[in-house]
C-alpha cells in the first residue's frame, strides 16, 4: 500500500509539473483506441475499453490540476461528487453496454442500459432540484485546457499584476501588451478573447425552464419505457422521444441571461436532433440505403476520400446498433 501511495504522489507531481506532456499522453491513449478498432476479433470492445480509459484519465488528471491550481468548482463537495459520478458513467457507458452484450446477451445489455440511464437520471434530477445546478451540460465537468493553464501559471510568475491587454483610445480595440504576448507557436492570431471563467455560477431556472430540463432528463427513461411497451420496430418510441426533445428545446427558447457554456449546450442539443436520422426505425427504413449509397459514390469518384468513407461504411452499422452511441 505504501508503494502505491508513493506511486500516486509521484504521478500527481508529474501531472502538475508537465500538463502539456500529460495532454499528449491522453491523446496517445485515445489515438490507440482508433488504431485498434476493426483490427481483430473483439477489437471493438478493446478499442472502446481503451477509449473509456482515456476519458477517465482526462477526468483524473483534471482533478489533480484543479487541486494544484486551486481552481475549485463553484459548488459544494456533494455536488462535485455527483458530477464526478455522472462523468464516470458517461465515460464507461458504451463499454459497459458492449461488455454486457458479450457476456449476458440482449437481456443483460438492456438491463445494463436501463440501470445506467436510471442512475444518470437520478443524479441529474438531484443536481437540478436539490442543488439548483441549472442546465445540465455535456460533459458534466468541463475539461481543463492544459495549454492555457500552463500559460496562466507562467504568466502568474512573470507578469504579476501587469495588465494583460489595453484598449485603444480611438479604435476601442483590445490589444495584448508585449509582455503578455504568447510564443509564436502557441499564439492565436485573432483578437484576444475575454474568456468566460469556468467558475461562473449557473443561471437560475424558472418554473418553465425547470420543466424543460426535467423533460430533457426524463427523455431517455421515457424512450426505454416505450421500447418495452411497443418494441424496437415501432415508430412510437422514436416519435415520443423526438416530441419530448423538441418540447424541451422550445421551452428553453429564451436564451437571454444564459452563460456562454449554457448557450453552447442548447446549440449542441439542437444539432443532436439530426441524430434522429440515424436512429431506428427511421434509419432502417429511409436513411441507411441513402447514406451508404452516398458514401460509396464518394469513395468511387473522389480520389483519396475512400480511405475515410469505406471504413465509415463498415463501422456505421455497428455504431448504429449501440444504444449509447445513437440514443445516449
Curated annotation (Swiss-Prot):
Any single GO BP term: protein import into peroxisome membrane
Residues that span the membrane, as ranges: 85-105, 111-131
Pfam families, A to Z: Pex16 (PF08610)
Gene Ontology terms: cellular component: endoplasmic reticulum membrane; peroxisomal membrane; peroxisome
Cell compartment(s), UniProt: Peroxisome membrane
Interaction with PEX19: annotated span: 213-328
Principal location: membrane
Region feature Disordered, mapped onto this chain: 149-169
Positions on the Cytoplasmic side per record topology: 1-84, 132-328
Peroxisomal-side segments: 106-110
UniProt keywords, alphabetically: Membrane, Peroxisome, Peroxisome biogenesis, Transmembrane, Transmembrane helix
Topology versus the membrane: Multi-pass membrane protein
Region ranges (Required for peroxisomal location): 66-81
Record's function text: Required for peroxisome membrane biogenesis. May play a role in early stages of peroxisome assembly. Can recruit other peroxisomal proteins, such as PEX3 and PMP34, to de novo peroxisomes derived from the endoplasmic reticulum (ER). May function as receptor for PEX3.
Self-association and partners: Interacts with PEX19.
The family this protein is said to belong to: Belongs to the peroxin-16 family.
Record's protein name: Peroxisomal membrane protein PEX16
Naturally occurring in which organism (per UniProt): Bos taurus
